[in-house]
Amino acid sequence: MQNIPPQVQSMLAQLESYQQQLQLLVQQKQKVQLELNEAKKALEEIEKLPDDAVIYKTVGTLIVKTEKAKAVEELKEKVETLEVRLNALERQEKKLNEKLKELTAKIQASLKPPVAG
């Protein structure tokens, strides 16, 4: 790295930072996607049940009885919240990928030998 100009070293450090941010973002996105899939599946299953079905939900370390209508409402809210979160993460991922692409291009341009003309 001693032959690399300080400006390029700085860009390389920024590139590494972006890559780490992207990795964390992808992990968050996967977690939210998994939660969303689970919530949708639970909602799908609950909606198949009769209205008077006995339903239990976990609250912390407890399991409590709830009504079907309340469980459906809570799950729909959870799905909506997770979809909003997922969309936000996807937008962030897209922006970060664009920054990575731009910075990579800048670094490559900086490292190319000048063209004699």
UniProtKB/Swiss-Prot annotation:
Gene3D superfamilies: 1.10.287.370. One of its GO terms (molecular function) is protein folding chaperone. One of its GO terms (cellular component) is cytoplasm. It is found in: Cytoplasm. Pfam families: Prefoldin_2. Keywords: Chaperone, Cytoplasm. Molecular chaperone capable of stabilizing a range of proteins. Seems to fulfill an ATP-independent, HSP70-like function in archaeal de novo protein folding. Heterohexamer of two alpha and four beta subunits. Belongs to the prefoldin subunit beta family. PANTHER family: PREFOLDIN SUBUNIT 1, PREFOLDIN SUBUNIT 1-RELATED. This is Prefoldin subunit beta. It comes from Thermococcus gammatolerans (strain DSM 15229 / JCM 11827 / EJ3).
